[in-house]
Amino acid sequence: MKNIFKNTILILGLLFFVSLSLTSCNRSDDEADDLPQEELSDVLLRVTDVATGTPVVYDYQVNSTTNPNVKLINGHTYNVEVIFKNGDEDATQEIKDAKDEHFLVYNFPNSDITLTRTDDASSTRGDGSRVGLKTKWVVNTAVKNASAPSQLVLTLFHEPVTVSEASAVSGNGVIYGTHTGGETDAQANYNIIN
């Protein structure tokens, strides 16, 4: 009887220890950064032509099989704001609250667009790099090669080890922003048309 009692206590003790050892997978202990990709439903671009002042919103729905067509005119300048949504709720503030843990990379694989980050202090990281929630685009050539798709691949990275606002030529286009490490919080694809 003592052995059964002793074994039961031992098994219960081990189960208790194992249950304490297991924790849920959370990328950060900071509650301000609870922004898992599964909770982002839309990535919106608010594109405002500087010449007209008229904004147009392009809505990429996460996991969609179709991409919004962003109409850009060669020679025009646009102010662009990225807005992240979770259903009807604006999740952009959560990214600003955890700005040191986020960074946007803009990839224009078949366009000649000069991008400048224009974030204010609310979305500028502690290392001085701007997250990229607000940008200015100067469109030199929206579609460089008409026989190939032109698009924007916009990626939000979480907890990158290093970031840079530098640009690099990539194939027939330009990538704005580089990073090492981290995870993808969201990726949105937009077709570029003119």
Over which residues does each language-model region extend?
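Internal, hydrophobic beta-strand segments that form the core of beta-sheet-rich folds
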Residues: 79, 84, 144-173
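Bacterial Sec-dependent N-terminal signal peptides
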Residues: 2-3, 17-45
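Bacterial N-terminal signal peptides that target proteins for export
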Residues: 1-12
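N-terminal edge beta-strand
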Residues: 47-73
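A beta-strand/beta-hairpin structural motif
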Residues: 60-66, 118-144
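Extended, polar beta-sheet/loop recognition surfaces of beta-rich domains
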Residues: 27-30, 91-131
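Short beta-strand elements
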Residues: 168-194
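Short, solvent-exposed beta-strand/turn "edge" segments of beta-rich domains on protein surfaces
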Residues: 34, 67-76, 143-144
